[in-house]
């Protein structure tokens, strides 16, 4: 079988690529620098609750890129999924059902009827256009079509962007937004359904993929930090790895797949002058981050039967409340309930403990105003302030084909996957899509 293909990173992008290659009989070795699988989706157990590293969700359910990979591998039954379909808005006059399709917009009680018609006039052309045409809008901000809308309709767009992109509308490419609307349109073969692993922890997806790789005699190693990719005469010849004990080892390799942000890899893993400086500078512009403050709350009882609630309006700091235990009770011990609330923030706030505390206090107070039982039922809270890298998949001028290519011209045996590379979709769906696009290129190289 020869020298194994080396995949750097055990997130969704790396593991879907490794699994697809394993399914075709290739020997694969996955190296992950942390102690856990899943990359940014790695979960943890805290006081017997399963906490995700932020709120993760599988968009488009069985139409998602992740599910299509599992289906191709014939292991979709290995991942039991819970539907996420009980979603609502909350405004000053109460709760309003989230539209599950284009036609549901006519029944959207959140908006006056005239606003619903305006919304349909915007969304219908997007929903029925082609993926190819959306590329014309990739450099255009979504706000170009929302700026002149009334405040209620703008608030609707903000909530949709929070669910789909975990960000505000001014950071979203119109092209990426349109592709999301197309893929949610059942008349175009899409679905607006979402899903979450029924056993709890979004990294369950990564563990299913890892198990498949191991079943095909592949290898998955944690605590293995790749320090260098060696390129000689325009070909990959090996990697230098540091293990948990601190010792370095040279591993021969003629095919290496990098599955963490390309703009980091280009600056960290190669000797100077291996990669053209202009190319590196071009990719470095993709290094844009969105910062988020999120808080897990554990409660003594259920305060709502819904799964997701979006407070609507500029007066709310809290942009989303996710009732994880209502999606699947497996994330919590018996008799307790887990929710997570979050809001995007400026990056500098994540380094300011006082600012973090102030925002957490505001979110707690807002949830209490919506749910009077919240404070009396609260057991504990666990704030998190962190920076995302997946914002690169949604900003104008930094989406779809403007992202890092899967190969660098002139270097054989080197490939890049993940949501920072050519792909579209939301978060991990984008990472899996990149694997679907890149895997045939790797196969072609291996046959050459």
Q: Where does each model-flagged region fall?
A:
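Dinucleotide-binding Rossmann-like beta1-alpha1 core, especially the glycine-rich loop
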Residues: 49-131
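Rossmann-like flavin
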Residues: 92, 107-183, 196
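Helical element adjacent to the flavin cofactor pocket in flavoenzyme catalytic cores
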Residues: 183-247
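N-terminal Rossmann-like FAD-binding beta1-loop-alpha1 element of flavoenzymes
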Residues: 3-30
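Glycine-rich FAD pyrophosphate-binding loop
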Residues: 22-47
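Conserved flavin/dinucleotide-binding core of flavoenzymes
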Residues: 324-448
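Mid-domain catalytic core of redox enzymes
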Residues: 227-337, 405
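Short beta-strand to alpha-helix junction loop
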Residues: 57-62, 134-138, 188-212, 353-359
């Amino acid at each position: 079988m020869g020298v194994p293909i080396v995949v750097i990173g055990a997130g969704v992008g790396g593991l879907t690529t490794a699994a697809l290659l394993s399914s075709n009989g290739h020997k694969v070795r996955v190296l992950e620098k942390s102690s856990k699988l899943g990359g940014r989706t790695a979960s943890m157990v805290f006081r017997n609750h399963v906490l995700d590293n932020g709120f993760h969700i599988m968009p488009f359910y069985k139409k998602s890129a992740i599910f299509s990979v599992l289906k191709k591998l014939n292991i979709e039954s290995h991942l039991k999924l819970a539907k996420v379909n009980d979603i609502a808005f909350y405004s000053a006059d109460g709760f309003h059902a989230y539209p599950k399709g284009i036609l549901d917009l006519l029944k959207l009680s959140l908006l006056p009827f005239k606003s619903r018609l305006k919304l349909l006039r915007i969304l219908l052309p997007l929903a029925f256009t082609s993926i190819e045409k959306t590329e014309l809008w990739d450099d255009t901000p979504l706000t170009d079509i929302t700026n002149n809308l009334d405040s209620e309709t703008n608030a609707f767009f903000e909530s949709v962007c929070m669910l789909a992109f975990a960000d505000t509308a001014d950071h979203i490419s119109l092209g990426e937004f349109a592709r999301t609307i197309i893929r949610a349109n059942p008349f175009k073969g899409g679905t607006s359904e979402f899903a979450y692993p029924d056993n709890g922890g979004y990294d369950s997806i990564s563990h299913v993929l890892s198990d498949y790789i191991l079943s095909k005699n592949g290898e998955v190693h944690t605590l293995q930090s790749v320090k260098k990719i060696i390129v000689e005469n325009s070909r990959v010849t090996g990697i230098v790895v540091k293990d948990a004990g601190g010792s370095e080892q040279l591993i021969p390799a003629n095919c290496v797949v990098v599955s963490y942000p390309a703009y980091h890899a280009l600056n960290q893993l190669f000797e100077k002058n291996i990669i053209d400086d202009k190319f590196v500078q071009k990719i470095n512009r993709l290094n844009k981050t969105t910062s988020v403050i999120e808080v897990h709350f554990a409660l003594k009882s259920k305060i709502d039967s819904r799964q997701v609630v979006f407070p609507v309006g500029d007066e709310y700091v809290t942009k989303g409340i996710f009732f994880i235990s209502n999606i699947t009770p497996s994330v919590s011990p018996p008799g307790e309930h887990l929710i997570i609330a979050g809001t995007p923030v400026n990056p500098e706030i994540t380094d300011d403990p006082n600012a973090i505390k102030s925002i957490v206090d505001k979110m707690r107070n807002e949830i209490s105003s919506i749910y009077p039982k919240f404070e009396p039922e609260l057991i504990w809270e666990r704030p998190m302030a962190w920076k995302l890298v997946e914002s690169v998949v949604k900003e104008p001028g930094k989406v779809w084909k403007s992202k890092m290519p899967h190969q660098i011209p002139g270097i054989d045996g080197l490939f890049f996957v993940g949501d920072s590379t050519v792909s579209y979709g939301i978060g991990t769906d984008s990472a899996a899509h990149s694997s679907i696009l890149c895997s045939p290129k790797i196969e072609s190289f291996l046959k050459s």
